[in-house]
């Protein structure tokens, strides 16, 4: 599919873009109020930090990538720290593919909320996949934000290690500062590696392109695809091979669309398992 045509469809008046389910993912950010969830999202999308605090009800963003000739869609769901609607919280978890749980190092209550959230994610996902929570694989990182306020720290390192466990493939922990932009790139790289997604999705590993440069992006994507077909590389992780565009006016999908998304993902996972069972060694 031509990337120029793709970007034209990103306007709200046009129909939804059709990208294969295997290339569509959703990143969900969860945590208490005032821990810095929106600041992390802002760093991810724009590289900027907004010092003013505005309470989030629920913010939805969408980003498209061209990576080595493939087009990817990443939805970003910035959830509310207050959850008056448990059903919506559960739906957010069900539709999530990768998770960032955020607490503030200077707020013990927010750490305890992350403990509850992690358990809720494991319980919800294990129910969906018909597995025990010990066996369900959910790409998840826990972030202790406000590392620049270490003097006011209320959470002990040993408690964090106990929560995270000793398997970095299941859960990773990062102490970050969204304000100082500290350790965020490493955190995103680890999360995408855990989910087996292209590392170029991390903000520091692709070029940011605005919508008005879609023709340039399309030409570069075609060039990279031709190089790949010719066996000339393109898979080395060079930022020149990857481009990202934040979709303007992205709208949260309807509940019906979310339910269809869950169904499609579950069906794709089931088919992959069936293929594994049919392999003759």
UniProtKB/Swiss-Prot annotation:
Superkingdom as given in the UniProt entry: Eukaryota
Keyword RNA-binding applies: no
Keyword Transmembrane helix in record: no
SMART domains: RAB (SM00175), RAN (SM00176), RAS (SM00173), RHO (SM00174)
Binding site for GTP: 31-38, 78-82, 145-148
GO MF term (any one): G-protein beta-subunit binding
Record-given protein name: Dexamethasone-induced Ras-related protein 1
Organism: Homo sapiens (Human)
Gene that this sequence comes from: RASD1
